[in-house]
């Protein structure tokens, strides 16, 4: 599923120079079902496909690679790997305190998308915030930090609810199905 999303327009919805990513959804689903290690592996796949996009026609990514390939690597790969791992850690921690065993799925879905945006934009600003390219994207002339906050608001308004509802709902359904399957196999 992740490779289909990564190599079709479904995974990265372009809005101006940046992209809204739906790739967080399978990562958080996997982190909830497979745990932190599985989330990290799926996050790594997300990061690698994101880094690949920089060489495959994504104008924003191509500009970043042209400025500094190593920093582009840092923006794409460790951030997504960390998001996947932490989504699994958060799910396990919330599972221990959630009496309903349902809220945990939706909160983890929401936080996975939040962490993706937070880690990506923070690393982007640290590595490239001083560059003329990012400075020129700030058409208002206001503080670049405020530009990043505005982008995060737009990005979060789209990614977080989708990851919460779709990621949480699918992970809950898969978890229930796996438990039923395990119970059937034990009989």
Per-region residue spans from a language model:
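Loop-helix junctions at membrane interfaces
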Residues: 1-187
């Amino acid at each position: 599923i992740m490779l289909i999303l990564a190599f079709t327009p479904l995974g990265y919805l372009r809005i101006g120079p940046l992209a809204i990513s739906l790739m967080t959804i399978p990562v958080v689903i996997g982190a909830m079902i497979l745990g932190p290690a599985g989330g990290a592996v799926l996050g790594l796949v997300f990061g690698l496909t994101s880094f690949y996009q920089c060489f495959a026609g994504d104008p924003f990514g191509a500009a970043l690679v042209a400025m500094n390939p190593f920093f582009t690597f840092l923006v794409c790969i460790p951030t997504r790997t960390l998001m996947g791992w932490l989504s699994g850690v958060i799910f396990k921690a919330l599972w221990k305190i959630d009496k309903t065993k349902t809220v945990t799925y939706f909160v983890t879905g929401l936080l996975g998308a939040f962490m993706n945006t937070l880690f990506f934009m923070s690393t982007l600003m640290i590595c490239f915030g001083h560059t003329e390219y990012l400075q020129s994207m700030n058409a208002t002339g206001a503080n670049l930090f405020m530009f990043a906050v505005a982008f995060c608001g737009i990005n979060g308004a789209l990614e977080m609810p989708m990851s919460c509802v779709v990621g949480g709902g699918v992970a809950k359904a898969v978890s229930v199905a796996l438990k039923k399957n395990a119970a059937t196999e034990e009989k």
